């Protein structure tokens, strides 16, 4: 997959239908201090020789440890993805909408044991409308999370539901 030039990254992101909060994170500004948990730095790897997956042009968002996060335009909408810099040929579609991406990021923050009131404040700061639904769904499903597989399945289903709801907005 070709990567948008580093000098064109922010203008291209600003041209997409992305929220001010997501754009701020892509610019290195955190809409809430706890969002540092979801971002380890500006895109570095994709501009310094790391391989990238084949497919449509990638617009890098940020790095998250050894993962690169990005968005690409597809005929049927946006696709948010991440890939390991060590295995770029196996990208993971995180979501098809920004709200779905927030669902993924909020799951990671929940796993860091952030206070629920703080998570609600972060949701308000970034405009994540589905946090109450996510929390209810997780509380109902969590007793079945004995192994990581059930959690992964629940998260995939949640993101699909959030993407579907966001597509109707």
Functional labels for PLM-detected ranges:
Residues 16-19, 97, 127:
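Helix N-terminus capping/helix-initiation residues
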Residues 65-68, 87-90, 128:
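Short, solvent-exposed loop/turn segments at secondary-structure junctions
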Residues 79-120:
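Compact, glycine/acidic-enriched structural inserts
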Residues 111-143:
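An amphipathic alpha-helical core segment
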């Amino acid at each position: 997959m070709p990567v948008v030039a580093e000098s064109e990254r922010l203008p291209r992101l600003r041209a997409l239908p992305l929220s001010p909060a997501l754009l701020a994170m892509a610019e290195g500004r955190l809409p809430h201090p706890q969002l540092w948990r979801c971002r380890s730095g500006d895109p570095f790897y994709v501009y310094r020789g790391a391989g990238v997956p084949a497919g449509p042009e990638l617009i890098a968002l940020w790095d998250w440890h050894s993962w690169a996060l990005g968005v690409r335009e597809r005929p049927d909408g946006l696709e948010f993805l991440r890939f390991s810099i060590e295995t770029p040929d196996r990208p993971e579609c995180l979501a098809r909408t920004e709200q779905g991406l927030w669902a993924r990021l909020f799951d990671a923050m929940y796993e860091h044991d952030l206070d629920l009131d703080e998570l609600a404040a972060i949701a308000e700061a970034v405009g994540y409308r589905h946090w109450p639904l996510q929390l209810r769904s997780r509380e109902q499903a969590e007793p079945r999370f004995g192994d990581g597989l059930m959690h992964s399945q629940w998260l995939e289903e949640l993101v699909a539901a959030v993407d579907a709801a966001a597509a109707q907005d």
